[in-house]
C-alpha cells in the first residue's frame, strides 16, 4: 500500500511538473524520493496504523511528509524546512485523500491477485490431471449422503476443476473493475485544485508508472462516493473460499475411515 501511494505521488509530481505548476527541481527531488520508497527504502518512517479513522488521511499525510522531508534532504536542506518542499502544497498537489487512498487500495489488490490466480491455475491443472488419472475408477454417486447412481471418480475431480476454473474467470472479471480510478477528482469529484492538464494526464502517467491498463472514471463523483469495485472483488474471493472449503470437506469425507468411514480415496 505504501509503495503504491508513492507511485501515485510520483505520477502526480510528473503531471504537475508537465503542467508547469511544480518547479523542475522540486519535482525531481520528489520523484527521486518516491523511487526510493517504491524500492522498499524508508519503511521505518511509516508509523501510522493500518487501521485508522478519517478514510486514510493520516496514511496519506504520513507518505506526503516522508516524501517531502526526503526531498528536502536531496535538495540539501534540513528536514522540516517546508519552504523547500511542502508535504501538502507540493507532494500532495492536486490530490485528496479521497482519490489517492482508494486508488492506492485498488493498485494494492491488483498487485496481490496474480499470486492467487497462479495458485488457482495450478490447482485447476492438478485437478484436471487427477480427473484423467481416475477416469476408469467407478464409485457410487450420492445425494444427501445417500447412494444414488454410479459415476466415475474422474468425473468428480473434473467437476472440481470446472468449479475452480469458474472462480478464476470470476476473479479476472472482478479484477477489471479495479483498473478504473477516481484520480483527478480530488476531494469529492469536483476536480477542485487540479489543473486541466493534470486531470487528463494523471491516470495515463500512473498507468505508465505501474504497468497496469488504468483508466479514469467517466463520473468522478460516482467513483469517489461509491467503492463497489472492492465489494465485487471481495465477493468473488469469498465465493472462491467457500468453493475451496466445500471441495476440501468433500475430500475429507471421502477419505474417512479406514474401517467405518467411506474410505474411497487416500489423502497423501
Positions of PLM-derived features:
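Conserved, well-structured ligand/cofactor-binding cores
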Residues: 1-268
Amino acid at each position: 500500500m505504501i509503495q503504491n501511494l508513492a507511485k501515485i505521488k510520483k505520477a502526480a509530481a510528473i503531471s504537475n511538473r508537465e503542467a508547469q505548476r511544480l518547479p523542475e527541481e522540486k519535482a525531481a527531488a520528489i520523484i527521486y524520493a518516491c523511487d526510493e520508497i517504491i524500492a522498499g527504502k524508508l519503511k521505518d518512517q511509516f508509523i501510522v496504523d493500518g487501521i485508522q479513522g478519517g478514510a486514510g488521511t493520516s496514511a496519506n499525510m504520513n507518505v506526503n511528509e516522508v516524501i517531502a522531508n526526503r526531498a528536502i534532504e536531496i535538495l540539501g536542506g534540513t528536514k522540516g524546512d517546508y519552504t523547500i518542499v511542502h508535504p501538502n502544497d507540493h507532494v500532495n498537489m492536486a490530490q485528496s485523500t479521497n482519490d489517492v487512498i482508494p486508488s492506492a487500495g485498488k493498485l494494492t489488490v491488483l498487485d496481490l491477485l496474480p499470486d492467487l490466480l497462479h495458485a488457482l491455475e495450478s490447482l485447476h491443472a492438478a485437478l484436471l490431471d487427477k480427473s484423467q488419472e481416475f477416469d476408469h475408477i467407478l464409485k457410487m454417486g450420492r445425494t444427501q449422503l445417500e447412494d444414488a447412481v454410479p459415476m466415475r471418480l474422474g468425473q468428480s475431480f473434473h467437476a472440481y476443476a470446472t468449479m475452480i476454473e469458474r472462480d478464476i474467470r470470476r476473479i479476472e472479471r472482478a479484477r477489471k473493475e479495479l483498473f478504473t480510478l477516481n484520480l483527478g477528482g480530488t476531494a469529492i469529484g469536483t476536480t477542485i485544485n487540479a489543473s486541466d492538464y493534470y486531470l487528463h494526464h494523471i491516470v495515463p502517467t500512473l498507468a505508465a508508472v505501474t504497468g497496469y491498463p488504468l483508466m479514469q472514471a467517466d463520473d468522478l463523483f460516482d467513483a469517489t462516493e461509491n467503492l463497489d469495485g472492492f465489494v465485487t472483488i471481495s465477493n468473488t474471493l469469498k465465493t472462491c473460499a467457500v468453493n475451496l472449503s466445500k471441495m476440501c470437506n468433500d475430500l475429507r469425507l471421502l477419505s474417512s475411515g479406514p474401517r467405518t468411514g467411506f474410505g474411497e480415496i487416500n489423502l497423501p
